[in-house]
Amino acid sequence: MGTNGVRVFVILYLLAVCGCIEYDVDDNVHICTHTNVSHINHTSWYYNDKVIALATEDKTSGYISSFIKRVNISLTCLNISSLRYEDSGTYKGVSHLKDGVIVTTTMNISVKANIIDLTGRVRYLTRNYCEVKIRCEITSFALNGSTTPPHMILGTVDKWKYLPFPTDDYRYVGELKRYISGNPYPTESLALEISSTFNRFTIVKNLNDDEFSCYLFSQNYSFHKMLNVRNICESEWEALNNNNDNSSSMPASHNNLANDLSSMMSQLQNDNDDNNDYSAPMNVDNLIMIVLITMLSIILVIIVVIAAISMYKRSKYRHIDN
């Protein structure tokens, strides 16, 4: 091997950076070489041995489509923002120096696949009563060497739901060696929902009744997320009290005026509703009655007139006979 070949080998060995780092979804990652930028002629960046881009002193070209909006590439650095599950893999930058030396920088990135989204939404609220729907959704998970499908549990110690996950229905990403939610798996199949009710003045004897947990567990691993649902109700009750306090702090005249207006509007609404419900049939009935009465009146008048004429003629004839 020539001197230059040995030199390149030594530099590749000493300057190669290989780190296996785990990131969360939406994290930002920076992969940089420590070589002076003035010594670099051009750098080729790779993702799982596929070229991402070629960076030169003048420009950078060749971004792959999935990275266009989330990546910033230069001669010395590869910066990725808003990491996704599918971004996991091996990244490598091969810098060609102006003196012919090649410097390689490599980093293995693993984006956490086990993602639990646990939320609570108030469905019904009064001064003393609160009903919350708790929803747990698994957006992604990894088998981590397990040979059995994972299972999901949502609830408290005394109240829970159970769901086995058929991994065959998930979208499997071979490069990541993990299952990710998405086509063709229905979104609603990835979640469990449970409802719980709370009374504001009930004394809490067991805090576990307020803590809801969502577990995902398999053969050799498990992880979970917790949510205090009663705290959600407490926040809503406090907001309700604040609104009532603001209303009660208004001057009495304003309250009376508001009440009067409210009563008037309610009465008008009730009257309108009554009119809408009954005015049409009542008008038709009245019209029919009026027509019948009018006809009977006319007939009666005609009968009276005829009778009067007949009586007049009879009296006249009697007078002539006499």
Curated annotation (Swiss-Prot):
Glycosylation-annotated residues: N36, N41, N72, N79, N108, N144, N220, N246
Induction, as annotated: Expressed in the early phase of the viral replicative cycle.
A GO-annotated cellular component: host cell plasma membrane
Membrane-spanning segments: 287-307
Keywords, ordered alphabetically: Glycoprotein, Host cell membrane, Host membrane, Membrane, Signal, Transmembrane, Transmembrane helix
UniProt cross-references to Gene3D superfamilies, sorted A to Z: Immunoglobulins
GO biological process: viral process
Keyword Transmembrane helix: yes
Matches recorded under Pfam families: Pox_I6
Top-level division of the source organism's lineage: Viruses
Entry similarity comment: Belongs to the orthopoxvirus OPG049 family.
Function, in words: Plays a role in the spread of virus to neighboring cells ex vivo.
Name under which the protein is recorded: Protein OPG049
The organism of origin for this protein: Vaccinia virus (strain Western Reserve)
